[in-house]
Design a protein with these regions (language model features):
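Short secondary-structure junctions
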Residues: 3-4, 134-142
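Conserved beta-strand in the GNAT
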Residues: 58, 64-73, 80, 85
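Conserved GNAT-fold acetyl-CoA-binding loop/helix
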Residues: 22-45
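A short beta-loop-alpha structural element at the N-terminal edge
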Residues: 1-19, 25
């Protein structure tokens, strides 16, 4: 597996992976697709239009795209790992942790990650990431979702990222 920065040429691949990601998330957020079958895309558009405060990364196994990660708040003191997705055949074999570590190597310093408490696999995964990256020096708190007062709050993990490993293979 290798990780590379996404750019505007990756629109079709990212749009397809994004649809799978949003479909997966709908199980935990209750979000239905729009009438055209799509889901919200504002984060995707931030990455694809080159917003300087956002960065997207694609994960590949050989020639096959197997996931992505979006980072935001790049000019802020605390960066946010905003979206993370791996296709099902490559989950639970260590590639997700490896991909996150490679992305984080580009963004040292404090990092926040939000996830849904009703997603037990995400809870285990993000706790493991925080522990692998920063030992036992991380925090977890529930924060309300902006503009959605009736929604279940997200869980946010905060840690100091000191990851430096990067993939050198194409």
């Amino acid at each position: 597996m290798y990780v590379r920065r996404a750019d505007t040429e990756d629109r079709v691949v990212l749009e397809r992976l994004w649809l799978m990601f949003r479909h997966d998330m709908s199980e935990f957020q209750g979000q239905l697709p729009r009438p055209d079958g799509s889901y919200r895309t504002e984060w995707l558009e931030k990455v694809l239009t080159g917003d300087p405060d956002w960065a997207g990364y694609l994960f590949y196994s050989g020639e096959s795209p197997v996931g992505f990660c979006f980072m935001r708040a790049l000019s802020q003191p605390v960066r946010v790992l905003n979206a993370f997705f791996m296709v099902r055949p490559v989950r639970r074999n260590g590639l997700g942790l490896r991909a996150v570590r490679e992305v984080l190597a580009h963004h040292p310093g404090p990092v926040d990650v939000a996830f849904q408490e009703n997603n037990p696999k995400a809870v285990r995964f993000w706790h493991r990431v925080a522990t692998e990256v920063s030992g036992d020096v991380w925090t977890s708190e529930r924060r309300p979702i902006a503009g959605k007062p009736d929604a279940t709050p997200d869980v946010w993990i905060s840690f100091q990222n000191t990851t430096t490993e990067r993939s050198t293979s194409p």
